[in-house]
Regions:
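Active-site region of the double-stranded beta-helix
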Residues: 2-18, 31-35, 43-44, 48-50, ...
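Short amphipathic
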Residues: 24-31
Length: 158
């Protein structure tokens, strides 16, 4: 599922991925980025928030904010889908953590990444409908493999 270009790049990087956190930028190595996320799948997550960890980044303040959760009879407390869509339409940036839940094809992709990097992975989606703010530059505790499906973000390599 990962392209031969990605496999080739991984094999040429002679590094210890566990301790070497030097960032790398590889452009054009994914044949079809829509394998990673589609708008239809994002809409599915917003319609079924009880299965995902959904957050929004404020369109001006560049930080997340609380969204009311409501009790459900057979699932964990979760947000009202209509409210999520309204927040989304207002232009706030969307975060869907654990996007791979419920999507077998995403889990297969993660399996390939886990084989290449010898680690446990998860898939998250960051999206915006219009010009939205992302979060401030920061360092994550975990390593990240970022695939930009569409849009424009300036990425710098070191």
């Amino acid at each position: 599922m990962l392209t031969s270009g990605v496999s080739m790049i991984f094999s040429t990087l002679n590094k210890n991925w566990i301790v070497d956190d030097t960032p790398h930028l590889f452009e054009g190595v994914i044949d079809d980025p829509s394998k990673f996320a589609t708008w239809k799948e994002v809409e599915h997550c917003l319609n079924f928030p009880c299965f995902y960890d959904i957050q929004f980044i404020h369109k001006v303040k560049s930080g997340t904010f609380d969204i009311p959760k409501y009790p459900r009879a057979w699932a964990r407390d979760s947000e009202d889908p209509e409210e999520l869509f309204n927040i989304w339409k207002e232009g706030h940036g969307l975060i869907i953590n654990n996007f791979d839940r419920g999507f077998k094809e995403k889990q297969k992709i993660l399996g390939e990444v886990e084989k290449a990097f010898h680690g446990v992975t998860a898939m998250h989606v960051y999206a915006g409908l219009m010009e939205t703010q992302s979060f401030h530059i920061h360092e994550d505790f975990t390593s990240n493999f970022i695939v930009q499906v569409e849009g424009e973000t300036l990425w710098d390599s070191v």
